[in-house]
Regions:
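Bacterial N-terminal signal peptides that target proteins for export
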Residues: 1-8
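Bacterial N-terminal signal peptides
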Residues: 9-18
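Accessory carbohydrate-binding/adhesion or oligomerization-edge regions at the termini
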Residues: 22-151, 234-264
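Short structured motifs
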Residues: 155-159, 170-172, 215-219
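Short beta-strands within extracellular/lumenal beta-sheet-rich domains
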Residues: 165-176
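Non-cytosolic beta-sheet module surface loops
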Residues: 177, 186-190, 235-237
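Aromatic-lined ligand-binding clefts that engage carbohydrates, nucleic acids, or primary amines
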Residues: 182-197, 231
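Beta-strand-rich ligand-recognition modules
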Residues: 198-246
Length: 264
């Protein structure tokens, strides 16, 4: 008897046919960190040909339990990003002094811990509300170059076997300019919600449950000042694949490429 694929499952139950052997598959297993990132060097780098910024200092993901992204309205993410998980966290990313994050720097923090996400179905079980458990952790800063135009935060986490669902990622970098560059816009795409600041001034906010789309939101006109400019951002996600892409564009929508990028 030949069974149609659509009837196969029913036939197994009704006729008592042997179940087909299946190997569990997980989207985040056997991830090669080096496929997505390389260590940042001391030398300045330029953005890619399309202006995307690939060099960043990334902080290990901070546990922020959420089983749904529908809560990511402006007020929610503003409050989430204002929280300091260690003393002087915000100030350290605002000024290029001795407290500015450094590659390999380890920070002791207190986070909203959560039990490991149940992945027996190959993806998070959204209906399970996380139990929040205050937890002392050590977070580390990493100076990386992304091998793609978008920074794949999910792979950054899985490549280190760190929490990848219900998290906040912080990123900061330094934009170097030989002269003032006026009337540019910061164009961002992120999965899921995010906020971005240039020289400690809010530039753009992306709220809601969203997928990463190139140039999804753009800031008002900005000026990149001669010298060093600090660009930082925070991305929050519940379930799903976290990533972002960032570049500056001019008034014609063309990428700004006459800049260099460092982590200090």
């Amino acid at each position: 008897m030949k069974l149609r694929p659509t009837l196969l499952s029913a036939a197994i139950i009704i006729l008592g046919l042997p179940a087909l052997a299946q190997t569990p598959r997980y989207a985040d297993s056997n991830i090669n960190f080096e496929k997505y990132f390389s260590p940042a060097t001391e030398a300045e780098v330029a953005p890619d040909a399309q202006g995307f910024i690939g060099r960043w200092l990334l902080l290990d993901p901070i546990s922020k339990p959420n089983r749904s992204n529908t809560v990511f309205v402006d007020s929610y993410i503003r409050e989430a990003f204002q929280r300091e998980y260690y003393k002087g966290m915000a100030a350290s990313m605002n000024t290029l002094d001795k407290n500015f994050p450094k590659d390999g720097q380890k920070i002791k923090a207190v986070v909203d811990g959560q039990k490991p996400v149940d992945l027996t179905a190959g993806r998070p079980r959204f209906y399970e509300e996380p139990e929040i458990i205050p937890q002392k952790v050590t977070l580390k800063w990493h100076a990386i170059d992304s091998k793609f135009f978008n920074v794949k935060l999910f792979r950054f986490a899985t490549g280190q076997d760190l929490t990848r669902y219900g998290v906040i990622f912080w990123a900061v970098t330094v934009i170097n300019c030989e002269e003032d560059i006026e009337n540019v816009r910061l164009a961002v795409g992120s999965n899921s919600a995010s906020m971005w600041w240039l020289n400690n001034e809010e530039a753009v906010i992306l709220s809601g449950d969203r997928r990463m789309v190139m140039d999804d939101c753009a800031s008002e006109r900005l000026t990149l000042k001669k010298g060093k400019n600090i660009l930082k951002g925070a991305v929050i996600n519940g379930p799903g694949m976290s990533d972002f892409c960032v570049r500056f564009i001019d008034e014609a929508g063309k990428p700004v490429t006459n800049i260099t990028i460092t982590t200090k």
